[in-house]
């Protein structure tokens, strides 16, 4: 996705399209939204979504559906899969899961995969896995992300300037919370794994350029655990899927 998201248009000859993404802030990552906004000729495609979440899926699938509809398509089904939480800034001790707990989640995913495969193979429609719908809709109706969320998250990230950007636009500024410590050896892995080329190496040290997606790849993949976010991540457990290697992250095809 990162290699094609900046094209003027994206098209495929496939009859079935699957969109797999992590839930960010109860919604769809900006990069996924940009990707879908460039998709053409999807009105006759069977489109399904799979979201992974560490906390709650919320109504991410409803947001995905709206974005797809804006391009003339229709989301047939949307599935949600529980995976380890890896946004380690909040309540670190409450979010970390043991290796054993991770393995149970992976078992759950493999079992879920079977049902997703059957559903897609049968071209089923109308299944949307969500949670906290009433609360999520209230957040939207009362514009709580704009009124409260934007201020809270920017403050936590250390961005103190006034901005008229929307909450979702402000995510790119939340990289203000990233910094490196004395363990940094200038290996450049952080800049290489960033899916949007948001990290520039200056004097052999990372500098974030305010195009952030908040995926935390830089923090999670740093071999020295030298990248921190705010003041609460030092010493915190890092996580990425054990079957994913750094070579996978560096491949952009």
Q: Whereabouts are the PLM-identified features?
A:
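FMN-binding flavodoxin-like domain, especially the glycine-rich phosphate-binding loop
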Residues: 1-8, 12-21, 25-165, 232-237, ...
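Residue-level preference for short coil/turn positions at secondary-structure junctions
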Residues: 12-14, 43-44, 174, 180, ...
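A short, structure-level motif marking secondary-structure boundaries and short turns
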Residues: 48-50, 175-176, 203
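Acidic, Ser/Thr-rich low-complexity intrinsically disordered segments
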Residues: 143-196
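Generic structural signal for beta-strand residues in well-ordered domains
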Residues: 9-11, 40, 171, 187, ...
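Iron-sulfur cluster-binding cysteine motifs and their immediate structural context
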Residues: 179-180, 185-213, 217-235
